[in-house]
Amino acid sequence: MSSFKPSRFSTARLTGDAVTPKSIYLRRREFMIGLGAIAATGAASSAFADPLEAKTTAYKVDEKLTPQNAVTTYNNFYEFGTDKSDPSANSGSFKPLPWKLTVDGLVKQPKEFDVEELIAKMPLEERIYRMRCVEAWSMVIPWIGFPLSSLLSQVEPLGSAKYIAFTGVVRPDEMPGQTGLFQALNWPYVEGLRLDEAMHPLTILSVGLYGETLPNANGAPIRLVVPWKYGFKGIKAITRISFVEKQPPTSWNRQAANEYGFYANVNPAVDHPRWSQATERRIGEGGFFGSDRRPTLPFNGYGEEVASLYAGMDLKANY
């Protein structure tokens, strides 16, 4: 287990100007004031995110944040379609609340959590993390959430539990990517972690970003964030978390085991068959090709905190 110890954090309200460029924050505030008049008439859309309060923490990187519009409109969420713009374009009908999250398996006290109650009760934190996609692009995102370990400890896991299995949602009526004759993946989306990975301080369940609740397009109402792994490990719209004894199946590994490993640790020395992992393109900075690419860091820059989890492992074989 890593010896990573974050410095003490202070309690503060995470306002938009704390993480958003000032001009954008001011425009948003003016817009929200105007929206208040619309809301009074009942015409406001439920798609507008609610503000969240969170603690500022030492979990941050000295890098420019990816613009909020890019984070919310350029991502992979195949339940809504395979194009990068599909999640934002096709998720308007998705209903993230009410939402139940079951935590079960090899535990003494299986529980079903109401996500709205979790958001109200858990000590939410802002975590500014790098996010690296296996497609060789990256972002820097100010997530809001809480350590996964703080939820898992509530169900009293048994000693026989070695892995954590995650299950996503199946709602073809609300998720057009789950309909049709030819499906990109088998549903539900499933993922997994070793127990020590799940309990690591860097691993969080996110319920928001940029000071607001998660947009549907980014995995509302609750998703996994593991910053040293490729983005496909970050399962969205989670419905179940189970303690299991054996390594659980994962969606992309099941789809193409030669391309997507179970561990999926960011590793510039191990290429994907279709994408070199040596460099990456930071979304929101420069053009698509050329000199704006930057070197990819082992474990996405979190090696000091997590490399000890894989001591003695062949990271090329266990990709």
UniProtKB/Swiss-Prot annotation:
BP GO annotations: protein repair
Enzyme Commission (EC) number: 1.8.5.-
UniProt KW keywords: Metal-binding, Molybdenum, Oxidoreductase, Periplasm, Signal
Cofactor: Mo-molybdopterin
Cellular localisation: Periplasm
Class of enzymatic activity (EC top level): oxidoreductase
Binding sites annotated in the UniProt record for Mo-molybdopterin: 75, 78-79, 133, 218, 223, 234-236
Gene3D superfamilies: Oxidoreductase, molybdopterin-binding domain
Keyword Signal on entry: yes
Annotated InterPro entries: MsrP, OxRdtase_Mopterin-bd_dom, OxRdtase_Mopterin-bd_sf, TAT_signal
Subunit structure: Heterodimer of a catalytic subunit (MsrP) and a heme-binding subunit (MsrQ).
Cited function: Part of the MsrPQ system that repairs oxidized periplasmic proteins containing methionine sulfoxide residues (Met-O), using respiratory chain electrons. Thus protects these proteins from oxidative-stress damage caused by reactive species of oxygen and chlorine generated by the host defense mechanisms. MsrPQ is essential for the maintenance of envelope integrity under bleach stress, rescuing a wide series of structurally unrelated periplasmic proteins from methionine oxidation.
Protein known as: Protein-methionine-sulfoxide reductase catalytic subunit MsrP
Origin species: Brucella melitensis biotype 1 (strain ATCC 23456 / CCUG 17765 / NCTC 10094 / 16M)
